[in-house]
Amino acid sequence: MRDWPDWREQIDAWQAPVLAREDLPERLRMALFNELYDLASGGSLWTAARPGDPVGRFGVLECFDYAWYESLDVRLYGSLALLQLWPELDKAVLRSFARAIPAADATPRPIGWYFTQGRGRVEAPRKRAAATPHDLGAPNESPFDATNYTAYQDCNLWKDLASDYVLQVWRTFLLSPNGEDLSFLAECWPAAVQALIYLKRFDVNHDGLPDNGGAPDQTFDDWPLQGVSAYCGALWIAALEAALAMAQRLQLDLGLNTAEEQHQFSGWLEQSRANFDRLLWNGEYYKIDAESGTPVVMADQLCGDFYARLLGLPSVVADERSRSSLNAVKEACFEGFEGGRLGVANGLCRDGMPLDPKGTHPLEVWTGINFGLAAYYRLMGDATTATAICSAVVNQVYGGGLQFRTPEAITAVKTYRACHYLRAMAIWALWATHTDWQLIPGAERAGSEG
């Protein structure tokens, strides 16, 4: 313990920028640091460095109930902490996905959701080549090598994972405190291209947008969507913008010929943009999907627009439609749900009533998605609603005895689900949007995590 004074000095310096921001509520400043507990007690795995892995391989469990590493749809939100504080570890995770995307594992597995629907045994291969895996595997197998551990849904069919991957690669290249790393971008580029081409196969009606298939096939994996959806469609458009930005940088700075990909992605993007609003805009907000007729306001309908704006890409939707949608979400899913006391519910009718009083995901408050939504409100200039949402969730977690085991979901009947959840570290999105990515001392030390 001879070095403890030096350690204490470094910890104080690390915390000082956050503690000094008196324009942030005190409880938010507290929670920013406390939510990092999951990196230490969330089942993290960190291997030794080796050729191709300069800081080793790294992964955090989605949670102990869903014990597989770095679920990609979840880390879209939750990895914003890792990006800002330990960016080389964030790159390590994305390199692991880059290796996993081309791989295949034909092992057949029964898909759990079909049993819950009384439809018997339906099997699917564990991992199709070019499909973006949901996760990097589980501790009871060979993580990083055997991916797609979860089998509740057939993740080869998910319509958000490829977009999630592309957005995270461009985000980490663009916003890492270590500066732009072209070798990292080049390493991930082939997998990003494969992932988008694979996802485009699900554009069944050739409108440029991948179609959801009716079984839950996105992060809300108990919530069926049909046809083009606001959630997956907006992510797709944002991912195409990110892929174009990648292609241009790689060609300009490294001389990589990406003309074919630029032409292809530009065509898809033009068609997607032409049809997204036409199919989904109802005059006030974006319909959950184009074909199910489900009359709910989905809280995270414009996650893709949030990410595009966060990364300085062209927005997915016009400012006035973003603000109109966010106002509908605020009235229906926040103020209309328990008076805003719990946070934002995932999906309610426009009058704040549940479509199905026995529903699961629509009636839950997802902590990490709430933090992401709060950051979106902040980006769009509504700091009051951003603070209100964040405060409601922090109060539920820390006032309800759930601190240091933050759940994925909280309900109005005082139940909760999936503690030690990775997505909740999305609270660091609020730091990014409020401070314009103010640097935390120590995060800029390239390669120092190893």
Task: Put a short name on every predicted segment.
Residues 1-58, 63, 155, 172, ...:
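Mature extracytoplasmic enzyme cores
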Residues 1-11, 56, 64-209, 227-247, ...:
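Aromatic-rich carbohydrate-recognition surfaces in CAZymes
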Residues 9-12, 19, 51, 118, ...:
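Intrinsically disordered, low-complexity regulatory segments enriched
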Residues 24-63, 98, 102-156, 204-227, ...:
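Extended glycan-interaction surfaces of carbohydrate-active proteins
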Residues 72-102, 162-164, 190, 238-245, ...:
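Active-site core of glycosidic bond-cleaving carbohydrate-active enzymes
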Residues 174, 178, 201, 249-252, ...:
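Secondary-structure boundary motif
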Residues 196, 273, 390:
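Short amphipathic alpha-helical/adjacent loop interface patches that line ligand
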